[in-house]
């Protein structure tokens, strides 16, 4: 199974890249974590945010492999505990499809991305910077995997 993290933004700070790659490399080959970066639209004083969101959303959805299960990361989504995320990960594996997780930019996800998602995950009720979300999602997914595989990484 492949977990695709499709995220708006390129040229992240080094600590974001290192943090994401740290968890990415821990996954076994049969549970690969892949990052696809979508260029962020240019935001300025008079930027048309709705148009930018639409373009970013179109690019994100174009990056989703056909047949993938789509999960949006969005505030109205389900707030899973770590054991609940582990259960979700097991369900996704049993489903047999790869999973695409969509992380929006500063203004979030386009309406098209939200509509295309069959699930929505609220990582936190806090407002988080989107670069940090990459690292948190990678760590959370690795922790969920470790629970499902009786790996000592997660401790109760």
UniProtKB/Swiss-Prot annotation:
Q: Has UniProt tagged this entry with the keyword Transferase?
A: yes
Q: How does it assemble?
A: Homodimer.
Q: State the similarity comment.
A: Belongs to the RNA methyltransferase RlmH family.
One annotated GO molecular function: rRNA (pseudouridine-N3-)-methyltransferase activity
Q: What lineage is this protein's organism placed in?
A: Bacteria, Pseudomonadati, Pseudomonadota, Gammaproteobacteria, Alteromonadales
Function as written in the Swiss-Prot or TrEMBL entry: Specifically methylates the pseudouridine at position 1915 (m3Psi1915) in 23S rRNA.
Keyword Cytoplasm listed? The answer is: yes
Q: Which residues bind S-adenosyl-L-methionine?
A: 73, 104, 123-128
Q: Which reaction does it catalyse?
A: pseudouridine(1915) in 23S rRNA + S-adenosyl-L-methionine = N(3)-methylpseudouridine(1915) in 23S rRNA + S-adenosyl-L-homocysteine + H(+)
Which cellular component appears as one GO term in the record? cytoplasm
Q: Which UniProt keywords apply?
A: Cytoplasm, Methyltransferase, rRNA processing, S-adenosyl-L-methionine, Transferase
Q: Where in the cell is it found?
A: Cytoplasm
UniProt EC number: 2.1.1.177
Q: Which protein are we looking at?
A: Ribosomal RNA large subunit methyltransferase H
Q: Which InterPro entries match?
A: Alpha/beta_knot_MTases, RlmH-like, tRNA_m1G_MTases_N
PANTHER family in the cross-refs? METHYLTRANSFERASE, RIBOSOMAL RNA LARGE SUBUNIT METHYLTRANSFERASE H
Main localization category: cytoplasm
